Amino acid sequence: MAKILMTGTSGAFGTLAAQAALKAGHQLAAAMREPDGRNAPAAAALRALGATVVEIDVIDDHSVARGTEAAIAALGGLDVLVNIAGVGTHGLSEGYSSAQLMRVFDLNVVGVHRMMRAVLPTLRAQQTGLVINISSLLGRLSLPFYGPYSATKFALETLSDTYRAEVSQFGVDVVLVEPGGFKTSWIDALVRPEDTERLSGYGQFADVPAQTLTQVEAMLDTRPEQDPAKVAEAVLMLIDTPAGARPQRTVVDFIGMAEPVSMMNDLATQATAGVYQAFGSDELLTLKLR
């Protein structure tokens, strides 16, 4: 059974993925902010299932270092890092202040980088390991009103691909999960643009983002197959798949976006292989197994 450190376990996807991992018999260090404060109920529920709960705020270098060290000590090692912590955005892009945009990037992109830097020395030293980064279909295509969020996921995709090549020869696998839209508490926590004065220049069009989000939520209510538990199942599948056999990207969507994004992924894989071969670096695309 794998020794797993998972971030964002107080949120919807994180809670489901943590529960799935524990029920499958894996050892889990469940990371979250304020496990003795506002997230105490989530922490208690995971402890009851057998998890070790560690406090990690992925936007704080010291918190990441302390929490990761505590997790590895509690687990007696580490096999898998699952990066789930993140935040969504919805609204007109111009209405987001520079500070808002920087905060979203700090959490969704730099936070993943912090976590990977914290665990990679351990994984590289043992010449084996797995990192699963939760991205989004909006990291492969763009839709209006999700600009800052989508930008972070495009960045995460590139960061993950680069890491994947750079650590492949140390036996460390880096893969992505790309969920579509799911109706979870994540929607309630979406970051909205704070510059209302700037948005006033859009007139009635400033109301369109809220209207479209209402339509999306109504649509999701009619699509029970778009179950967030499917994302947790995808994470568990990747953990249980042998090294060298895992897909680089796993799309999780059941409302029509999976096929076109999967086609884009296949084309990107082919193009990337050609570029790496042209530069004589194609061996980096193959995971080195012990």
Which positions does each model-derived feature cover?
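Conserved glycine-rich cofactor-binding loop
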Residues: 10-11
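Rossmann-fold cofactor-recognition segment
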Residues: 47-62
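SDR active-site lid
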Residues: 169-246
